[in-house]
Amino acid sequence: MKKLEICVPATTANLGPGFDCLGLALDIFNVAVVSWREGVRLTPDQLYEWAKKQPFEQQAIAAAYSYYASQQTVDLPLIDIDFTCDIPIARGLGSSATCAIAGLMAGQYIHQGSCDKEELLKLTTDLEGHPDNAAPAILGGLVLSAGNETGPVTVNLPCHENIHTFLMIPDFELSTGEARAVLPEFIPHREAVKQLAAFGFLLQGLARGSHDLLRQGNLDFLHEPYRRQLLPEYDTIKKRLLDCGCSVVSLSGAGPTILGLFAGSADEADQLAPLIVRELPSGWELKRVQINHSGLRQFCF
């Protein structure tokens, strides 16, 4: 029996004004160990039916595996999936993207014997509908991405070692569909101009590790003014994080997790955590998480 271990990091997307195009990989992982035997292989249609019968916690990985078979028009063996989920589900930390990547990676490796990250990113984007979580999860670090008719386009951007991340994770879920439903179709032109400026300041602040530049980038008109109504405690938590010294506070992806970016030394970041939790609303957990620079990792044994 052959085995493949696939480690996929969590991601935080948007980072405020980088709506649907900016993402950052984090050192929290979902790990899938996939086992299979060579021999009998199933058609894509058979794999699709098999995937629907898998346990809930493995179903997304199995579905992505069958999707790979259908997209490549190949027969693949059945797989056993041992899944360790350390990324909170439906919290805006890219958990669905990790499952899609794991299933597609399994199919790609069994089919080709290697990992082609460019192809993997295209397939994941096709399956997920957008690359803002998939790109940093696969490539690691801070990634700017966009989708076009030929597939996703990405670029890794510099992120200073003085940038530290804090996650405020609630004990409730928020579906991406619900968060998308509250967004307007249009925003005023003057707000779009301010958004562009904030995005530029955000990128420069991340590259230079500058608190002042990041504060200028702590602005969004595309999603947070509308999604905050789904989180009654958002304003309270955002004020707390800013008062404690965070440079940027934003929803992580579609929420409900709230991201705080701090520009300073590691010692200063260590001192920040006790201040934040001192007046934390009930039902919220603080996690200080390192930035992940390696992205997707796989081991065959």
Q: Which role does the model predict for each range below?
A:
Residues 1-91, 109-115, 291-294, 301:
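ATP-binding N-lobe of GHMP and related small-molecule kinases
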Residues 12-14, 23-26, 73-74, 127-128, ...:
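Solvent-exposed alpha-helices and their adjacent loops that cap or buttress functional pockets
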Residues 28, 38, 141, 169-174, ...:
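Glycine-rich beta-alpha junction loops
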Residues 28, 93-115, 138-143:
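DPxDG-like acidic metal-binding loop motif
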Residues 34-35, 137-139, 143-148, 259-263, ...:
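Short beta-strand-to-turn element immediately C-terminal to the catalytic PLP-Schiff-base lysine
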Residues 115-162, 249, 255:
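Alpha/beta catalytic cores of group-transfer enzymes, especially the acyltransferase/condensing modules
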Residues 162-239, 243-244:
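Acyltransferase
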Residues 206-301:
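Glycine-rich, charge-dense phosphate/pyrophosphate-binding loop(s)
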